[in-house]
Amino acid sequence: ECCHPACGKHFSC
C-alpha cells in the first residue's frame, strides 16, 4: 500500500 505524502497519505508503512 502507498503510504507516503505523494499518494495523499501520511501513515507509517
Swiss-Prot record:
> What S-S linkages are listed for this chain?
C2-C7, C3-C13
What PROSITE patterns does the entry give? ALPHA_CONOTOXIN (PS60014)
Named from the GO MF annotations, one term is: ion channel regulator activity
The UniProt keyword set, sorted, is: Acetylcholine receptor inhibiting toxin, Amidation, Disulfide bond, Ion channel impairing toxin, Neurotoxin, Postsynaptic neurotoxin, Secreted, Toxin
Fetch the InterPro entries from UniProt.
Conotoxin_a-typ_CS
UniProt KW Secreted keyword: yes
Q: Give compartment(s).
A: Secreted
| Record carries keyword Magnesium | no
**GO CC list:** extracellular region; host cell postsynaptic membrane
Tissue expression pattern: Expressed by the venom duct.
Q: Which residues carry this modification: Cysteine amide?
A: C13
Name the domain of life: Eukaryota
UniProt similarity note:
Belongs to the conotoxin A superfamily.
Record's function text? Alpha-conotoxins act on postsynaptic membranes, they bind to the nicotinic acetylcholine receptors (nAChR) and thus inhibit them.
The Swiss-Prot or TrEMBL note on domains reads: The cysteine framework is I (CC-C-C). Alpha3/5 pattern.
Q: What is this protein called?
A: Alpha-conotoxin GII
- Per the UniProt record, the source organism is Conus geographus (Geography cone)
